[in-house]
Amino acid sequence: MNVEPIWQPVLLEEENTVTSHREPGEEFLFYRSVAAGLIDAVQDNCSRGAFENMEGVGKLSDNPVTNLRYHFVVTAAMLTRFCMEGGMPLEEAFGLSDEYIRRMDCCNNMSEIVYVHDQMAMDFVCRMRQLRKNIASSKQVAEAIDYIYVH
């Protein structure tokens, strides 16, 4: 691969810096929980402050607020795709994502971004829960669907 000289110092600096990234398991569990409509699991994730824990995640910006903004956009994109895969209509999913990204764009600090993130996660999960309830034709079917998504 031929890399332009302007990028070589950046690449060399990155090679000398050891960055430890955590496994994506917890992150993907969060996305699957939202798509499955598992409100309690998502509330737990938000109350634990999992989103604001920057340990082991990529450093997308040297500015902590900008870094969190970028991670917010990634989360919004992932939730959108997981929820569409779970049955949320395309326009609803993209509309939610766009709206919450615009709300985040008005935030001035990390705590405001975290607040909007938690609102977004709860909005997506509640909509997915309602969607799944509408699909289930009986209590037994709803319980079976819950069991499948949890396991």
Where are these regions (language model features)?
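Inter-domain helical "communication" segments and dimerization helices
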Residues: 1-151
